[in-house]
Amino acid sequence: HALARRARRCKYDRMIAFGKALPAIRERVEQDLALRGLPRDKVLATVVRLLETTLIRVGNLEYARRNRSFGLTTLRDRHVKVRGTQLSFAFRGKSGKDHHISIADRHLARIVKQCQDVPGYELFQYVDDAGQRHQISADDVNAYLREISGDEFSAKDFVPGPALF
C-alpha cells in the first residue's frame, strides 16, 4: 500500500505542477495560433489546443499502422469535417473505441481546414521553407510542450487518468 500511496502522491504533485504551468502553455499556444501561414509551431499549437479541448489522445504511428486506431497526430483528413465554425471528428481510437467529437471554434476550424488543404492524407502536417511536407508526430508535440512549459510535461498530462484517491 505504501508504494501505491507514493505513486498517487507523485501523480498528484505532477498534476499540481502541470496546473501551474498551464497558463504559460496556453499563452504560448495562443501566440503560435496567431502565426501567419501554416508553420510548424502553428500546427503544433493547434494539436495542443485540441488535446486540451477534446481530450483526444495524442496518437502513435505504430498504433495507426498496426491497429488502424488513431489519435490527434495520426488523424487523416477524412477523420474531420469542417463546417463553418464547427469541427466534427469521427475516428477509431485506442482499443477500437469509436469517437465522435464536435467542437465549435472559428479559429481552430480555419486552421484545421488549412491543414486539410496541404497535399497528402495526414491531417496535421506543415510545409517547411524548402517546400517539404512534414507530418506532426507525438514526439514533436511532446518536444513542443517541453519547450513552451520549461518542464518535462507531455501530451499525456492533458488526458485524465484513473482517479487519484
Report residues per predicted region:
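A positively charged, amphipathic N-terminal helix/segment that binds anionic biomolecules
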Residues: 1-70, 74-165
